[in-house]
């Protein structure tokens, strides 16, 4: 006897369930944002650290991806394919706690005094001078960062330090209300936020801003649109964002930057500019600059591995073949 379709199986019901789930998620984010700003910081810190430890013990899919990435860091740094399991687990726990601190600070950033952001930020003087010298001269600057430390706090610092504002790109989160909340949050810090998808191509707008002598900040250690550049990082092939294409297109200064946590404070290193090669095709220049960028990221991550919050696959060997360009897929 055939089973009659249940109302719960209908497409209409599925769509309703999806919309309800998104609304509840959006409500939870907005409520959490308001509550965390009101809870005493030590209590909030304890709650976020505890949540990180629970996730670490459960060792779900995201934690497994994080550990796979960190395994490559340890293996390369130790020059050995054999990684001590206890060392890896200890590092992944520290990384999840660092990631939890990032989110706690994101939620609380609107109530952190500017004076605290300025006094707690430790930046190498030479890099800081180079960044603002370029901007003062009217030359556009691209800051390219890995997912390390608290780059949102670093953004608040660079605005307060005198950059005025900068432009960045954000992935569209679901539900839309959460994405809009993050856009408003970043705009409140002095950022112009462009959507990665669902709007005009961000590349053209970013190029306009750079030609106007503005600052652009992009997290660049992951290929978000499957149009990135293949590089070697930690002895493995990986795909990172083609941020270097903006420098080739506009002549803007490409400055790698790494951020990390220093006790209760924050550290940042602004590296020397990666120049556009004098010879080669446009594509060859982008690849060469991207490889240099990957080398800087590699060194920064190796120095502060617990502050690399990479819970997504970046290494070619770990990627789903369906996500690779046709030129990278194995022949049948």
For each feature predicted by the language model, list its residue ranges.
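Membrane-anchoring hydrophobic helices of lipid-metabolizing enzymes
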Residues: 2-142, 190
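Non-catalytic C-terminal accessory region of glycerolipid acyltransferases
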Residues: 2-5, 12, 16-20, 80-84, ...
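Soluble or luminal CAZymes and related metallo-dependent hydrolases
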Residues: 27, 62, 123, 198, ...
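Catalytic core of membrane glycerolipid acyltransferases/transacylases, capturing the structured
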Residues: 109, 137-198, 226-229, 262
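A conditional alpha-helix N-cap/helix-loop micro-motif detector
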Residues: 121-124, 148, 175, 196-200, ...
């Amino acid at each position: 006897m055939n089973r009659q379709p249940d109302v719960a199986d209908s497409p209409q019901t599925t769509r309703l369930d999806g919309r309800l789930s998104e609304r509840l998620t959006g409500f939870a984010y907005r409520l959490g944002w308001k509550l965390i700003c009101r809870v005493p910081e030590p209590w909030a810190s304890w709650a976020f650290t505890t949540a990180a430890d629970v996730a670490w013990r459960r060792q779900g899919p995201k934690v497994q991806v994080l550990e796979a990435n960190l395994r490559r860091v340890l293996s390369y740094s130790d020059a050995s394919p054999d990684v001590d399991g206890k060392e890896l687990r200890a590092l992944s726990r520290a990384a999840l706690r660092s990631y939890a601190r990032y989110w706690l600070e994101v939620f609380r950033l609107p109530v952190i005094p500017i004076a605290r952001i300025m006094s707690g930020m430790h930046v190498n003087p030479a890099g800081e001078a180079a960044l603002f010298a370029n901007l003062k001269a009217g030359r556009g600057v691209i800051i390219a960062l890995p997912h390390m430390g608290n780059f949102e706090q670093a953004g608040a610092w660079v605005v307060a330090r005198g950059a005025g504002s900068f432009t960045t790109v954000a992935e569209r989160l679901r539900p839309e209300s959460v994405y809009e909340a993050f856009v408003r949050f970043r705009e409140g810090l002095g950022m112009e936020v462009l959507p990665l998808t669902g709007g005009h191509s961000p590349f053209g707008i970013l190029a306009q801003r750079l030609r106007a002598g503005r600052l652009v900040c992009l997290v660049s250690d992951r290929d978000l649109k499957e149009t990135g550049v293949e590089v070697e990082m930690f002895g493995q092939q990986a795909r990172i964002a083609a941020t270097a294409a903006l420098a080739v297109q506009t002549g803007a200064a490409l400055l790698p930057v790494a951020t990390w946590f220093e006790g209760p404070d924050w550290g940042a290193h602004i590296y020397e500019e990666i120049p556009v090669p004098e010879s080669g095709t446009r594509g060859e220049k982008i690849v060469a600059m991207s490889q240099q960028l990957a080398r800087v990221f590699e060194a920064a991550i190796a120095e502060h591995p617990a502050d690399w919050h990479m819970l997504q696959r970046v290494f070619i060997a770990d990627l789903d073949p369906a996500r690779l360009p046709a030129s990278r897929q194995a022949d049948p």
